[in-house]
Amino acid sequence: MSRPLILVTNDDGYSSKGIEILNNVASNFGDTIIVAPNSEKSGKAHGITLYDPIGLKKIDNQNQLIYSVDGTPVDCVKIAINSLLDKKPKLILSGINHGLNVGRSILYSGTVSAASESIMIGIPSIAFSLQKSEEMDFTNVDIILEKLIKNALDEDFPNDVVWNVNIPKTVNEKINGIKLTKQGKSNFNEIYHKRKDPRNNTYFWVDGAIESIEEDLDVDEVAIRNGYVSITPLSFELTSQKYLENNQSKGFFDFEK
Amino acid sequence: MSRPLILVTNDDGYSSKGIEILNNVASNFGDTIIVAPNSEKSGKAHGITLYDPIGLKKIDNQNQLIYSVDGTPVDCVKIAINSLLDKKPKLILSGINHGLNVGRSILYSGTVSAASESIMIGIPSIAFSLQKSEEMDFTNVDIILEKLIKNALDEDFPNDVVWNVNIPKTVNEKINGIKLTKQGKSNFNEIYHKRKDPRNNTYFWVDGAIESIEEDLDVDEVAIRNGYVSITPLSFELTSQKYLENNQSKGFFDFEK
């Protein structure tokens, strides 16, 4: 039996530690190709590059096919599928992000967006993130990844939801298990530092931290805090069915000019 | 009674025709402030600027308070709320985008993302887009905007869904009405043009067009094609409830290391 093709990407750049570990584990299950940004692209969300040329470089590496893209994580998936791969990959893996992607800040995440782009073209996908610590410690992360990637290669793995996987930093010592969770409402609480440049122009630096407002153990961020690996199934069909049902019959929408 | 504060933004830049018309109509209902990108930021999605300083300029204009931000549409909303406004606006309006934001390509849209950022902080929001034509013709668009903005200032207007409003280019002659719609599955069908620079480095330009695969009149893109203004209520709570219900009891998630 031929080995499945697995596309590996991220938003921290092709040379990050996280993508190296993800690719090492994925290589146990299939033929991998890395197509990832040339540098840190955190916060790029589902952005695409429309008005600039997108540079592509093949990285010199004897053991692994790696392409570096001067663009966003979503650009990487699109260019891989449209121009680099001979066949459709069986699975697209994104990460391992250096830092959590939980709560509302998921919307800003390039790691998750590479995965949502994948399911939009019908390819199953997982986004992996490891909780930040002073020195990112990836000990034991491979054990979690092995279990999840093996499962994702099963025929019944969904291609219409993204598995958003977040791993607590305690994984280097122990974890309490894996939890299927909901996206929480916790948000990134920004502080904008206002400064002046030498020519007296105003500019800002953004800073801040996740504001924890959740308590239920089935919420992504709370599961992590309690030492669980969190898996949130995300759908990108955005229509609010509830709003449609409650408002469909309102006269307002029958307006004729 | 004091007039409500309305924040106006977009992704085409503060000097675009679309935002001027949107702001003109909004001014009939409240005190407006424009905080918008300094240039075209289409395709920036929900991106935020994490690793660069974000420049801010007050634009010299006697009749209207305008700030220009060297950042994404979401940066504009965040900086306005965090640093520029004395009080929370009653409503945040985004657009009018020069071109539709329908189907799956909503995910790439800076116009829609400024609106989704707004509901994440609990402020009602509408994203407006006008179908592209060779010369963007905004005739009669103000009539539609007036009706929708007036409605959005009602106390019962939702602050947990975005109204994604798309207006057909036929509005300059006639429209057939307003339809409450669903987000379609039509996607942007990209073509990547591969080129070489003078130093033999590979780069790509992206090009393409919306691929229409929908037929039901209650789908955003089909409503537009049939001469209706399309209003899709969008929610950004991404958890797939369906997946949770179907998989919650699976042993897989009880894994103990």
Question: Locations of the language-model features?
Answer:
Chain A
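Hydrophobic/aromatic ligand-binding patch that stacks against planar heteroaromatic rings
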Residues: 114-118
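A cross-family phosphate/adenosyl-ligand binding-site feature
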Residues: 2-6, 17-83, 87-88
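Glycine/threonine-rich flexible loop motifs
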Residues: 100-109
